[in-house]
Structures are given as C-alpha cells and as structure tokens.
Amino acid sequence: MSIYLGLFEFEGPFVEHDELKDESGVYAILHFVDNEYKLLRCGERDSLQKWASRVKLDEIKHRLPGKMLLTVYYTNFPKEARKSIAKAITEEFRQQARVSYLIKPTLQAA
C-alpha cells in the first residue's frame, strides 16, 4: 500500500521493524483518528530499519486512541535533502492543522 505525503509516495504502513529495508530515507509516524491522518513525527535516517528497531512503537500506540501507522520513503538522497523532505511534510501538515502532538518516539537502548 502507498500513502502520499506531499509529493512523495511513502510505503507502508509497517507493523514490525524487520519489514523495513536497511536503507536510508524519510519516515512518518501517522495517527489515523476522526477519519484523517495526523502527523505524529517525521524525520530522516541513514538506516530506517535500524532506527525502527529502537523505537518503542507499542508505547506510543497505548497512549493514543485510533490507529498508528509507520510509513517510509526510501531514498538515497543526501542527509540534507532528506531533512528538507521531512521538514516540508511537517509544514504541510501544520498548515492544514493536521499535526497531532508531534511527539518524539522513545528509543530503546542500543
């Protein structure tokens, strides 16, 4: 399944971190509530799989009503370009008043 965020086609939603590829890209954690997607967090990582393996997604799910989705956009763009994509998506959601909490996921110890 694909989810379009801005001009980018994100893959997902993913339930388990081992479903992700060990590649660089942009991630978005979405909260589906009241029949719309709200953005919880958007960012970039050199290894989406490694990052996702450390995020305590279950902890977030228990704190929020509705459904939480992890989506990714794989790209080998340089880090600064990936940051720009994440920033643009965050701003788009803010302008549409569709930002939900903008939380920072808790990471497990490496």
Question: Where do the protein language model's features map onto the residues?
Answer:
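GIY-YIG nuclease catalytic motif and its immediate N-terminal context
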Residues: 1-54, 77-91, 95, 103, ...
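A broadly used, surface-exposed interaction patch
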Residues: 50-74
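Carbohydrate-associated surface elements
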Residues: 98
